[in-house]
Structures are given as C-alpha cells and as structure tokens.
C-alpha cells in the first residue's frame, strides 16, 4: 500500500520538473531560430541591421542610391528650367510669418550633376501647399558661395525664390585665412541673422542644401510648435544619422526606451492566454518575464531601431521628442527668437576640426544655465548629400 500511496506525489513531482525543463529547451530553440534563422533572413539586406551583409550588398546599394539621386537631380533641373519662365510663386514674402525656412547652399563642384539644392527646393515647393489656403512657410535661399564661378543652381532659383547673399564688400574679406569649419559656422550665422533681419519670423527652420524634407515635414513641425516644450527650447534637431540611432548608446532615454519595449512585449506575450498554444510552457513568472524582456530587446537592437522608428510616421502625434544629441545640423528648428541666441553663441566660439558648429552648439547648450535642446525621431529630412562640401570625398561614396 505504501508504494501505491506515493504514486500521485511522485507523478506530480515529475510533472512539475518536466514543465520547468520544457521551458528551457523551448527558450533555447526559440532563441536559435530567431537569432540564427529568422532575423538573419529578414535583416541581411537592411542597411542599419547588425545582420546586414556589408561585403555583399553595400557597393550595389550605394551605387543604386547615387543613381536615384542623380536622376532626381536631373528631373529637378528640368523642372526649375521650365518654372523659370513662369510667374514667381514663392518670391513675394510676408513679414513676420509663422514659419521661415532658410536653405543654406554653396557650390559643390564634385556633385554638380546631382543638383542637391534643386532637389530640396522642388520637394519644398510640392509640400508648401499642404497646410490649406496659406502656404506652410516662407522660404529663403541663402547662397554663401564665395568663388568666382558662383552657384548656378541658386541663380536658377532666383526666378521663383528670394535668394540672399553677402554684399560685395563682405565677399572681399580674406576668407582663405579661416579653416573650413570656421567658414561653415560663419556662413550659418550669416544665414540665421539675415533671415531674421529680413522677415522677423515667429519660428525658423534652417536646412542645409542636401536635407530633403519628408512629405509630412510641415505637419510635424506644426505639431512640435504646438507643444509646450517648444517654448523653452533653444533648438530642435530634425535629423540624426540613421547609423547612430541604435539602442546601444550612452543616451539614457534610449536605454529606458529599450528596456520599456522589451518589458511591454514580454508582458503582453505572457499575459494574454489566447496567444499561448498548449505546448507553450512559459508563464508570467519573474524568470520567464526576464527571458522574454531580454529576448525582445536583443531582437529589436539586432534588427535595427531605425526600422522600428519608421512606424511612428503614421501620425505627427507619434513622433518622439527627446533630449538633443550632438551630431549633426542638416535640419534645425529654432522656435521663437532662439535663432538670434544661437547666432550669438556661435559667434563667441571658434570652430576647428573636431569642434565643428554642431559640437560647439551642443556643448554650449549643456553648459549654459537655462538652455535646453531636443531631437525629434524619426528624421524629418533625408540626407542626400553623398558628396560633402567641407570634407574630402571618395570617387564613389558609400552609404556606410
């Protein structure tokens, strides 16, 4: 009788141990399939994924992007050549507009066939009417080219847009004595101040001539300006390089976002019974919750945070605002009269290699009491400038 009485207890003990041992091999199998098969198959062509096969696809993808940009540039050139014979649509500017967009441009000899400026201005002309009866913003082109050959693309746009330049006396200054980064900073400050002096806008956006706005550019800008934080910020960055958008970063907010994403997905998976088939051995326990939190965190990082951010484009309300990062300045929003403060701060600093205007501005923002700055994600512009105007360029630039 004694062995028979022990049978139920023995079976219960074995069943309990088997259930736990079933979760361990399931976790191992799930991890092996996810990180060894599914994600490599899904991510081997994604440029910003850890699984991207750089040696196989980078050259071809880089060449494809260059050819697409070249075609857009030629199309934009034809578009503005035709438009030059039409009455000016954007040249009559109103004083104190709600938003001024200033596009800073210079001649790029190595990229002259790509016509970056013409691409950007064509995109702006297409999305400016998206705000209803009144166009979304006033637009200026700030031509900072000092060479004798001039900036032909800016000259072509003069038929449709207001183009501002330095006076002949300012052009004669001995700019060659300055390093490239200091000249770039002074050009930026000139455009900030001249745009303000000319129109006194309530808010200002400064785009570099290789920052192509997204279709929802003005809708998101309007939403950002309607939020309370914009009244107390020095600037809002509208672009951050995609390769630097990963979770594995020193920025605290990204680490919190990363852990939060893993925890929410893990809780949802373990909490909803209808998602769990009969063979699923996991329960809402601390051990299983920790495993799936780390599982989803690893999957999100390896596949690429950039691609998760793209889902936020569904609505302006979904765009994320966070403390500003250091690099870079292709697209900047200056709420209120903060553009004047930025011009003063930059004027007081001297830029050199390793201390360009974006680094100087970020360091000043962090040291000056009462100043703060923000970034918006995902990006509101696409950086199309494969050929730099301030650095040495390879013959065929690569995406990475």
What are these regions (language model features)?
Residues 2-63, 258-262, 267-400:
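C-terminal catalytic/acceptor-binding lobe
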Residues 82, 90-95, 119-136:
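Short, acidic, metal-binding catalytic loop of nucleotide-sugar glycosyltransferases
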Residues 97-105, 124, 135-141:
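Hydrophobic targeting segments
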Residues 100-116:
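A conserved hydrophobic helix/loop-capping motif in glycosyltransferases and polysaccharide synthases
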Residues 142-202:
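Active-site-proximal specificity loops/subdomain of glycosyltransferases
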Residues 200-212:
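Short beta-strand-to-loop acidic/aromatic patch adjacent to the donor-nucleotide binding site
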Residues 215-244:
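Conserved donor-nucleotide/metal-binding helix-loop-beta segment in metal-dependent transferases, i.e.
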Residues 247-259:
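Juxtamembrane/start-of-transmembrane alpha-helix segments at the extracytoplasmic/lumenal side
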């Amino acid at each position: 009788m004694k062995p028979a009485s022990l049978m139920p207890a023995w079976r219960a003990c074995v069943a309990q141990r088997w259930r736990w041992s079933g979760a361990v091999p399931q976790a191992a199998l799930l991890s092996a399939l996810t990180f060894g098969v599914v994600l490599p198959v899904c991510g081997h062509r994604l440029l910003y994924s850890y699984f991207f096969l750089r040696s196989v696809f980078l050259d071809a993808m880089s060449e494809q992007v260059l050819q697409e940009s070249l075609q857009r540039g030629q199309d934009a050139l034809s578009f503005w050549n035709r438009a030059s014979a039409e009455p000016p649509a954007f040249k009559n500017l109103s004083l104190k507009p709600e938003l001024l967009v200033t596009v800073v441009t210079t001649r790029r000899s190595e990229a002259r066939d790509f016509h970056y400026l013409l691409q950007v201005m064509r995109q702006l002309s297409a999305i400016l009417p998206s705000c209803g009866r009144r166009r979304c913003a006033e637009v200026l082109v700030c031509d900072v080219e000092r060479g004798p050959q001039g900036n032909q693309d800016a000259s072509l746009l003069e038929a449709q847009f207001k183009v501002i330049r330095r006076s002949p006396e300012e052009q004669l200054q001995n700019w060659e004595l300055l390093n490239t980064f200091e000249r770039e900073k002074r050009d930026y400050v000139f455009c900030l101040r001249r745009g303000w002096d000319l129109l006194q806008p309530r808010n200002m956006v400064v785009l570099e001539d290789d920052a192509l706005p997204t279709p929802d550019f003005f809708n998101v800008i309007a939403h950002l300006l309607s939020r309370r934080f914009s009244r107390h910020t020095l600037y809002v960055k509208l672009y951050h390089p995609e390769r630097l958008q990963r979770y594995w970063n020193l920025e605290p907010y990204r680490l919190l976002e990363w852990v939060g994403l893993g925890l929410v997905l893990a809780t949802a998976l373990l909490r909803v019974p209808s998602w769990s088939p009969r063979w699923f051995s996991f329960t809402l326990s601390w051990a299983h919750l920790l495993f799936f939190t780390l599982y989803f965190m690893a999957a999100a990082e390896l596949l690429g945070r950039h691609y998760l951010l793209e889902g936020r484009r569904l609505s302006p309300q979904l765009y994320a605002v966070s403390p500003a990062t250091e690099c870079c300045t292709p697209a900047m929003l200056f709420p209120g009269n903060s553009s004047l403060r930025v011009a003063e701060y930059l004027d007081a600093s001297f830029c050199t290699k390793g201390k360009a205007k974006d680094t100087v501005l970020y360091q000043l923002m962090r040291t000056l009491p009462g100043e703060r700055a923000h970034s918006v994600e995902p990006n509101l512009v696409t950086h199309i400038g494969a050929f730099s105007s301030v650095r040495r360029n390879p013959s065929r630039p690569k995406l990475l």
